[in-house]
């Protein structure tokens, strides 16, 4: 997965790793709290906004999730991870046309094996 993470503070990666574990342990409120603090500390880190969007989405807070996803893409437009997280946030919010627009936006900039796989699965499903 391509990702422009050069210059990303190590604490961002550490916190995201912890947050993924918290979500897996169904401790979403604590994960949200940690990401809100991370975004406050690193407001220009697209990856932090993208993971906050993902966690908010898992809580059904789709409007807030989409807002943070948009910020993430603006801050890190060439990050595949950011784009994929935003795509999933939009998809889970039933914003399918916007999700497909995000996919098209990213694949126009970069090759993406993961998006290629998603497209293949959609074609198999007749979408």
Task: List the predicted regions and their residue ranges.
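Alpha-helical segment of the N-proximal tetratricopeptide repeat
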Residues: 9-44, 51
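Alpha-solenoid helical repeat scaffolds
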Residues: 16, 47-51, 81-86, 101, ...
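Conserved structural position within tetratricopeptide repeats
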Residues: 37-40, 70-74, 107-108
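TPR/TPR-like (Sel1-like) alpha-helical repeat modules
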Residues: 87-114
């Amino acid at each position: 997965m391509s990702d422009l993470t050069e210059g990303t503070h190590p604490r961002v990666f550490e916190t995201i790793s912890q947050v993924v574990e918290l979500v897996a342990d169904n401790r979403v409120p604590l994960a949200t709290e940690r990401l809100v603090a991370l975004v406050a500390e690193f407001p220009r880190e697209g990856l932090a906004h993208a993971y906050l969007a993902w966690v908010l989405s898992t809580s059904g807070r789709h409007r807030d999730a989409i807002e943070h996803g948009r910020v993430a893409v603006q801050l890190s437009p060439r990050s595949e991870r950011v784009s994929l997280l935003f795509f999933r946030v939009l998809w889970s919010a039933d914003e399918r046309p916007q999700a497909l627009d995000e996919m098209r936006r990213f694949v126009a900039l970069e090759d993406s094996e993961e998006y290629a796989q998603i497209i293949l699965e959609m074609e198999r499903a007749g979408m």
